[in-house]
Amino acid sequence: MSKLHIKKGDTVYVNAGEDKGKTGRVLKVLVKEGRAIVEGINMVSKSTKPNAKNPQGGIVKQEAPIHISNLNPVDPKTGKATRVGRKVSSEGTLVRYSKKSGEEIK
C-alpha cells in the first residue's frame, strides 16, 4: 500500500461521490482500510438505543468513512484542491508540500 497523502487535522476537498465539491477537516484516518472520517462529509443516520448519554435514544446523524482516493488536501495558499509532494527540508525532516503553489502543508 502506498503512503497516505492526508493526515488527521488536514482540510480536504471531496473530489468524487455524493459530497463532491465540499471541504472538511479530517477527524480520523483509518490506515488499514484506506479511508478517512471527515467532519460534515458522508453523513449517515444511525439508530441508537436509550442510554445514559442519550436517554431518549432515536436516530443520530454521524460521519461515515470515505475512501482517501476521493479526497485531496486543500492548498494553504490558494484554498483550492492540490496534489501533495514530499521533500526533505533544511532541517533534514520530510515535509509535505503543495504541488500547485509549493507551499508547505502543516
UniProtKB/Swiss-Prot annotation:
Q: Which GO terms describe its biological process?
A: translation
Which CDD domains does this UniProt record tie to the protein?
A: KOW_RPL26
Molecular functions (GO terms): rRNA binding; structural constituent of ribosome
SMART domains linked: KOW (SM00739)
Note whether RNA-binding occurs among the keywords.
Answer: yes
Keyword Ribosomal protein assigned: yes
Give the matching InterPro entries.
KOW, Rib_uL2_dom2, Ribosomal_uL24, Ribosomal_uL24_KOW, Translation_prot_SH3-like_sf
Provide an example Pfam family for this protein: ribosomal_L24
Q: Where is this region: Disordered?
A: 69-106
Q: Which UniProt keywords apply?
A: Ribonucleoprotein, Ribosomal protein, RNA-binding, rRNA-binding
One Gene Ontology cellular component: ribosome
Give the quaternary structure. Answer: Part of the 50S ribosomal subunit.
Functionally, this protein is described as follows: One of two assembly initiator proteins, it binds directly to the 5'-end of the 23S rRNA, where it nucleates assembly of the 50S subunit.
Matching NCBIfam families, A to Z?
Answer: rplX_bact (TIGR01079)
Query: In which family does this protein belong, per the annotation?
Result: Belongs to the universal ribosomal protein uL24 family.
Q: What is the protein name stated in its UniProt record?
A: Large ribosomal subunit protein uL24
Organism of origin: Bacteroides fragilis (strain ATCC 25285 / DSM 2151 / CCUG 4856 / JCM 11019 / LMG 10263 / NCTC 9343 / Onslow / VPI 2553 / EN-2)
Annotated gene: rplX
